[in-house]
């Protein structure tokens, strides 16, 4: 399941409106149960480039080979969103 530009815009709106990234993740999971959404500490993502920045919040795209996760800059390969708050 790829993440489309519309998905990313919609996720950005949800994340921007939420009181916290955890709340945003819960809202997005309810809205799109097929999409994996993870919340991690911003420090863990310090060497990665976000797909989207929303003030103190960042959204990263991730993909999995079934065993390992990796951050990707290619939405067509992404199967998950990773959210952080600085």
PLM regions: where:
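Conserved N-terminal glycine/acidic-rich loop preference
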Residues: 4-5, 15-18, 46-61
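Translation machinery proteins
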Residues: 39-40, 45-47
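Short, compact, well-ordered microdomains
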Residues: 55-86
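Negatively charged, low-complexity tracts enriched in Asp/Glu with abundant Ser/Thr
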Residues: 1-40
């Amino acid at each position: 399941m790829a993440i489309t530009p519309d998905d990313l815009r919609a996720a950005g709106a949800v994340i921007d409106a939420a009181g916290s990234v955890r709340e945003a993740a819960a809202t997005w999971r309810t809205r799109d149960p097929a999409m994996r959404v993870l919340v991690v500490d911003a420090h863990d993502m310090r060497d990665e480039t976000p797909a989207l920045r929303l003030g103190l919040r960042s959204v990263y795209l991730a993909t999995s080979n079934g065993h390992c996760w990796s951050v990707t800059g290619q939405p067509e390969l992404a199967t998950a969103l990773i959210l952080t708050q600085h």
